[in-house]
Each structure stands twice: as C-alpha cells, then as structure tokens.
C-alpha cells in the first residue's frame, strides 16, 4: 500500500513538473508516414510505417530557441540477431541552438545539410509521391544530417545559408555518398563539409535555388600520413636512406576522396498548379571505386482539381506525374522512373496518396498516408 501511494505521489509530481516546465514557450510537433509498396513483377507487397518523428522546440526569448527532432524508423528497433529480422533505428536528426534577429541567424548542433529541396523539407504532406523521390536516395541522400554550425539570412527576396558540418566517410564513398554520411557519430573535421545555399522568392508561388557542397572526405589512409616525415632526404642512391618514400606519398594521395556536389532546384505552387524540379551532380576525385561522377534529376507536375469537383475550401486533390532519371555511376546505365498519382489533402497537414508507374524494369503500385503538426 505504501509503495502504491509513493507511485501515485510520483505521478502527480511529474504532472506538476510538466505544468512548471512545459509552457507556451515550448511546442511539440512531428510527422509520420505509412507506406504500402508493391512491385507488379513479383506481386509481393510491403506494408511499413516508415517514419515516426517527434519534434520539440523551446523559445528562450524572441531571438534564441532550441529545436530538436528524434526519429524512429520501421516500427521496431533492435539488432537482427535479437529480433530475427533487420530492425529499424533511432536517430537524433536535429538538435541545435538557433539565433534569429529578423535579418540573419546562427544555428549550432545537429543540423540538416542544406542541399536540395527534400533534405530540409521532407514532411510527407510537402511532396506528392508516397516515398521521397528515389533520386534523393542516391544523389542527394535524405535525410543527411551531422554535427556542425551554420549562418543564414535574408536580403529582400534572396535567402542565403552557409553551413559547416562533419566530414563524409571517404572509405564508404563509391557510386554515391549515401553510405558515407556519418550522422554525427564520431564526426571528424579533417576537411569540414562546406555548403553554400541560395534561393530567390521574388514571385508569388515561385522559389528558385541551388547549393554547392564540398568535402575532402578522409579515409583510413589518413592515419598513414602522420607517419610521413616532414622532409625526405633520400641521398645519392635514391630510396636507400629514407625507406619506401613512394609508399608514403601514395598514402598521402589515398588519404582523401574529393566530393563536390552541385544542385539546382525550383518549386512553383499557385493557381492550382504544382511544379517541382531538381537536378544534382556529384564529382569525385581519387575515388577508390573509380567512379568519377553521379547525377540525376526529377520533375513533378500536378494540378489541383478540388475546386472543379467541389471538394471544399481547405481541401486539395492533385493529379500529378513525375519523370526522373539518375546514374549512380555516369559511366553506367541510368535508372528511369515514371509515376502517375493522386494525392488527396483534406487539410494542409494530412495527405493520402496513390501512384502507379515504372521504376527501371519494375512496375510499381504504392499507397500511403502522411501527417505533420
């Protein structure tokens, strides 16, 4: 009885603390999405609650705030040996202090790399398709986040951002950078990942932008560089006095993989028309896999017919299509994607989606729902 009383008092105390610490300055949000994905060639369907995200924001005053986001993917988290199948994962995708004075700002902590449209704005109701564009998985991976800091601001209709985040993993770069994301785990700053982004919003409904991201991604061979002497006096007989200097020089050359990612994007949403496009290209130097570049694009076009069929003032019903193509290795074959879909939004923060089409050699059919708040 005494233990039950202590438990009840503890619960009441927690509610009292919640009233004390969670006030109007603290807000809670989030988003999530459920997918049904079937490839017509094999007839097997997959049902997956792909993402569940909780978002916390606290305003310390009118200029300083804390923003954070925690994600759970694929329902269950755990090792394959423990679950009997490959489980999902938990990640802290964002957690940063933010300063904004109306003209310019600063943020530091766990940040999203400001490259492309979808990496920064990937809540399910903000894009038409059930899944995020496949191009984004392999050319500009989403979600791409790391520890770092950024400065940003506005000048009339022009928005700018400069970000410095942790290195990519040079040993994991092959035909793409998706596997090279460190996600804030033991991040290094041998080169820093540097991103410059700009956008223009001077026309109603239109946003045009682009970015450049650069990093000399360190590899395991970086450790060998420390063993190279500051000077190599090999004497009259070549290598005899300094050992195998050639190996040392090779280690320096192999110590990094150069990555240069450029992208251009545009979005238009007005007068019942929806259009979005993005083109991205990655150039590599000293890539052990021999891949020199990766590139791709996608174009979405849609029209909101809700007014035509009397769906209601706050309702959207989009008929849309997507054309996309990407090459993880520009010396190889492209994967072409064509989709046709319907997206119903009973309100701006909810979406129900259906699409059919082709992805490479596969026929696909997908359904999904998503929310954000």
State where each predicted segment sits.
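Outer-membrane beta-barrel biogenesis signature
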Residues: 5-31, 36-45, 112, 117, ...
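Outer membrane beta-barrel
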Residues: 20-39, 43-170, 190-208, 303, ...
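Extracytoplasmic loops and strand-loop junctions of Gram-negative outer membrane beta-barrel proteins
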Residues: 37-39, 130-135, 177-182, 218-220, ...
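Outer-membrane beta-barrel proteins
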Residues: 39-43, 77-80, 115-120, 169-174, ...
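Outer-membrane beta-barrel "beta-signal"
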Residues: 151, 301, 362-373
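Detector for outer-membrane/organellar transmembrane beta-barrel domains
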Residues: 200-329
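Internal helix-turn-beta structural module
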Residues: 337-362
């Amino acid at each position: 009885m005494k233990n039950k009383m202590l438990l009840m008092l503890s619960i009441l105390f927690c509610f009292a603390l919640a009233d004390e610490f969670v006030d109007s300055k603290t807000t809670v949000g989030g988003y999530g999405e459920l997918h049904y994905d079937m490839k017509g060639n094999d007839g097997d369907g997959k049902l997956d609650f792909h993402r569940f995200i909780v978002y916390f924001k606290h305003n310390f005053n009118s200029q300083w705030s804390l923003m954070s986001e925690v994600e759970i993917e694929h329902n269950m988290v755990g090792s394959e040996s423990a679950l009997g199948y490959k489980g999902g994962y938990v990640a802290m995708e964002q957690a940063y202090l933010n300063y904004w004075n109306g003209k310019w700002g600063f943020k530091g902590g766990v940040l999203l790399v400001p490259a492309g449209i979808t990496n920064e704005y990937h809540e399910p109701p903000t894009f038409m398709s059930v899944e995020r564009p496949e191009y984004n998985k392999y050319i500009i991976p989403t979600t791409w986040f790391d520890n770092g800091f950024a400065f940003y601001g506005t000048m009339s209709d022009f928005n700018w951002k400069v970000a410095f985040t942790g290195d990519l993993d040079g040993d994991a770069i092959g035909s793409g950078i998706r596997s090279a994301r460190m996600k804030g785990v033991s991040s290094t700053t041998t080169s820093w990942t540097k991103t410059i982004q700009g956008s223009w919003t001077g026309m109603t409904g239109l946003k045009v932008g682009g970015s450049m991201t650069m990093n000399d991604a360190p590899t395991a061979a970086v450790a060998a560089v420390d063993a190279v002497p500051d000077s190599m006096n090999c004497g009259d007989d070549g290598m005899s006095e300094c050992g195998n200097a050639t190996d040392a020089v090779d280690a320096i050359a192999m110590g990094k993989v150069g990555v240069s990612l450029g992208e251009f994007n545009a979005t238009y949403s007005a007068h019942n028309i929806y259009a979005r496009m993005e083109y991205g290209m990655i150039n590599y130097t000293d890539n052990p896999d021999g891949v020199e570049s990766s590139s791709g694009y996608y174009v979405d076009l849609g029209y909101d017919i809700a007014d035509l069929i009397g769906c209601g003032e706050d309702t959207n019903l989009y008929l849309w299509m997507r054309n996309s193509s990407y090459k993880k290795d520009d010396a190889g074959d492209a994967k072409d994607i064509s989709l046709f879909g319907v997206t119903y939004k009973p309100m701006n923060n909810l979406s129900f989606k259906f699409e059919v089409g082709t992805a490479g050699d596969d026929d696909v059919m997908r359904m999904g729902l998503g929310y954000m708040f």
